[in-house]
Amino acid sequence: MKLLPSVVLKLFLAAVLSALVTGESLERLRRGLAAATSNPDPPTGTTNQLLPTGADRAQEVQDLEGTDLDLFKVAFSSKPQALATPGKEKNGKKKRKGKGLGKKRDPCLKKYKDYCIHGECRYLKELRIPSCHCLPGYHGQRCHGLTLPVENPLYTYDHTTVLAVVAVVLSSVCLLVIVGLLMFRYHRRGGYDLESEEKVKLGMASSH
């Protein structure tokens, strides 16, 4: 069904061309008749030359038929060209745009994929060079250097001070415990000595 409009159009063009060719031949005959009427007593040879003979007319008819056949053959042999629809044109433009966007890819995804050792690659379009965003603890152009942790002197001083205070407190507690035990033992021993002296005195008194 899609080929029908193009075939009809070509047939119409062929008919127009054949009409034009026929019109040209009729125009020639009219010119000859006009020349004959303008010269009423022309020589016999001139009139015979202007008026076509039967053989000439038959030849012209054959030529016209051959021309029409050639036009019809050309019309049927040529392949119809599909008309471009707006939808197809839009799809073509979208495909072209997609191809153009595909060329502008991030070089860090392919060319500089392994450029940063311990970090993330970021391409600087203005400078046209890759840059690395290093992970914590790494430094350098390609994040290849390891940053060693440095102790804070203030933090070290505070830690030492706390340990010293704790040691002093524990030592003081130990000394207090030792002193308390000694005092308790001495007090107990003093009471035991008094009891023994009283027993000795009582024994001596009973012996007398």
From Swiss-Prot:
Q: Which GO terms describe its molecular function?
A: epidermal growth factor receptor binding; growth factor activity; heparin binding; receptor ligand activity; transmembrane receptor protein tyrosine kinase activator activity
Instruction: Quote the InterPro entries the UniProt record gives.
Output: EGF-like_dom
Give the Extracellular compartment stretches of this protein: 24-160
Enumerate the spans annotated as EGF-like domain.
104-144
Protein name according to UniProt: Proheparin-binding EGF-like growth factor
Q: Does the keyword S-adenosyl-L-methionine apply?
A: no
The protein's assembly and partners? Interacts with FBLN1. Interacts with EGFR and ERBB4.
Q: Where is this region: Disordered?
A: 82-103
